[in-house]
Amino acid sequence: MNQTLLEQFGNARERVEKGLQALRDGQGVLVADDENRENEGDLIFSAESLTEAQMAMLIRECSGIVCLCMPDEKIRSLELPMMVEDNSSRYGTAFTVSIEAAQGVTTGVSAKDRVTTVKTAAADGAKPADLSKPGHVFPLRARPGGVLERRGHTEATVDMMRLAGLKNPCGVLCELTNPDGTMARLPQLADFAKKHGMVLLTVEDLAAYRESQEN
């Protein structure tokens, strides 16, 4: 990992704390995983403060596969089955079936409709009947141990919502891409973060932060 690129956003602890404050302020953060893993950066927003403009940015600047990261207990309360029974994906990404809000959407694919779906699913007291399946939002189940159990963007998202002290631990993510459709790597992630006034941190930063807080 190129520390020179990362250090313009502070040291590891500062990057995490800036990211947590950004989430409290309703802003987005960029989180990169290890270069030997997916080697990708995800743009992350909290579900509770997500706006149509932020969703439009996710659709425009990223892969378009907007995911809603939720704790295991939330997935179970919504009775969302996993997408496949036998997950053979390389990194064990825990997709459930895709979802749509049962009310208040049209085709489900617009930024407005996807925000409606995210907020419907993430809401306190949301019920299985509030959602239709399949849809245009892709829920992801976070491991209970967060990034200390799995060094994934899903776990990083839920961990950050909790560490930020947000009422709702759910968050949305999408992988940042370049204009030509290739995946954005660390240099492009740093450029994007600077252009949009965001902080760039890593999953490893977050894991180290949690370990220092909890030990």
Curated annotation (Swiss-Prot):
Leader sequence residues: none
InterPro entries recorded: DHBP_synth_RibB-like_a/b_dom (IPR017945), DHBP_synthase_RibB (IPR000422)
Site, Essential for catalytic activity: residue positions: H136, E175
Cofactor note: Binds 2 divalent metal cations per subunit. Magnesium or manganese.
Cofactor: Mg(2+); Mn(2+)
Residues that bind Mg(2+) 1: E38
Gene3D superfamilies: DHBP synthase
Membrane-spanning intervals of the chain: none
Binding site for Mg(2+) 2: E38, H153
Pathway(s) the chain acts in: Cofactor biosynthesis; riboflavin biosynthesis; 2-hydroxy-3-oxobutyl phosphate from D-ribulose 5-phosphate: step 1/1
Record-listed D-ribulose 5-phosphate binding positions: R37, E38, D42, R150, R151, G152, H153, T154, E175
Top-tier EC class: lyase
Name of the protein this chain belongs to: 3,4-dihydroxy-2-butanone 4-phosphate synthase
The species this protein was found in: Desulfatibacillum aliphaticivorans
Gene: ribB
